[in-house]
Design a protein with these regions (language model features):
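Amphipathic alpha-helical hairpins
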Residues: 1-128
């Protein structure tokens, strides 16, 4: 869809497309991880912080992906601030999930968060 968009943009579309994809993938993975944490019967109380961060990260990633898709007359400072918030949410969520890496869903989620964080960093660098 980015290639079909008539707005020329001023950022590498491959870097942009990767970031959009990673944001939506991370949002889905974090939502699924939160749900999986809720199924850990004897550990739900201990996983409250992880669940909360998963859901916060999912919402922020979803919003970031939607902001990035809109190309026409984008506001660079707003977009950069959103990317910064997303990379921070991903870093925080990954750190928490890594504490529970013995649970496969948390390990997978941490990896998705790190990929999204890296994609946000790459796009921020391309926007400078």
């Amino acid at each position: 869809m980015l290639e079909a968009h008539p707005w020329p943009g001023n950022v590498d579309r491959d870097v942009l497309a990767r970031c959009i994809d990673e944001c939506f993938t991370c949002a889905q993975t974090c939502t699924s991880c939160a749900d999986a944490c809720l199924s850990e019967k004897d550990m739900v109380v201990e996983l409250r912080k992880c669940i909360r961060l998963n859901l916060d990260c999912a919402d922020i990633c979803e919003t970031t992906g939607r902001v990035l898709i809109r190309q026409t007359e984008y506001d660079a400072p707003l977009t950069k601030a959103q990317l910064q918030a997303c990379r921070e949410a991903c870093a925080t969520c990954a750190e928490e999930c890594e504490r529970h890496r013995d649970m496969e869903h948390c390990s997978i989620c941490a990896e998705a968060c790190r990929r999204c964080q890296e994609a946000c960093d790459a796009l921020l660098a391309a926007m400078k």
